[in-house]
Swiss-Prot record:
Occurrences of domain Globin (ranges): 2-142
Binding partners and assembly: Heterotetramer of two alpha chains and two beta chains.
One Gene Ontology term, aspect cellular component: haptoglobin-hemoglobin complex
SUPFAM superfamilies hit by this protein: Globin-like
UniProt organism field: Xenopus laevis
Domain of life assignment: Eukaryota
Protein task: Involved in oxygen transport from the lung to the various peripheral tissues.
Protein name from the UniProt record: Hemoglobin subunit alpha-2
GO molecular function: haptoglobin binding; heme binding; metal ion binding; organic acid binding; oxygen binding; oxygen carrier activity; peroxidase activity
GO biological process terms held by the UniProt record: hydrogen peroxide catabolic process
Disulfide bonds listed in the record: none
Alphabetical keyword list: Heme, Iron, Metal-binding, Oxygen transport, Transport
Binding site residues for heme b: 88
Lineage: Eukaryota, Metazoa, Chordata, Craniata, Vertebrata
Length: 142
């Protein structure tokens, strides 16, 4: 999915706010995904799935850090996420259907925490960005 100049502007405007609270927002999004879609837990057999557990907040921070890295390379998301794509496709073998689930939950969390900043244009841009990242992360699956 091609990101327009306007999309990139909105992503660059909101990502620093999300990244500043990566453990909190990423943890909330992960917790929501695990709660609403229990099958996603299978890839994390040793996790404590309680709200604000150390494993969930740590995983959430990794997710947001990776998204922030991608946001810093909007003209080369595939290149900036290549190693992470390899990890998910070849080592972790995560179900590619899980990426859109986490993306949806991250949109919910961002909308809750930034209601004024999360206007329709930002919503559209962030949704396109997360879809692009999901596509990149699943590009090496067969």
């Amino acid at each position: 999915m091609l990101l327009s100049a306007d999309d990139k502007k909105h992503i660059k405007a909101i990502m620093p706010s999300i990244a500043a609270h990566g453990d909190k927002f990423g943890g909330e999004a992960s917790y929501r995904m695990f709660l609403v879609n229990p099958k996603t837990k299978t890839y994390f057999p040793s996790f404590d799935f309680h709200h604000n557990s150390k494993q969930i907040t740590s995983h959430g921070k990794k997710v947001v850090d990776a998204l922030n890295e991608a946001a810093n390379h909007l003209d080369n998301i595939a290149g900036s996420m290549s190693k992470l794509s390899d990890l998910h496709a070849y080592d972790l073998r995560v179900d590619p259907g899980n990426f859109p689930l986490l993306a949806h939950n991250l949109l919910v969390v961002v909308a809750m925490h930034f209601p004024k900043q999360f206007d329709p244009a930002t919503h559209k841009a962030l949704d396109k960005f997360l879809a692009t990242v999901s596509t990149v992360l699943t590009s090496k699956y067969r």
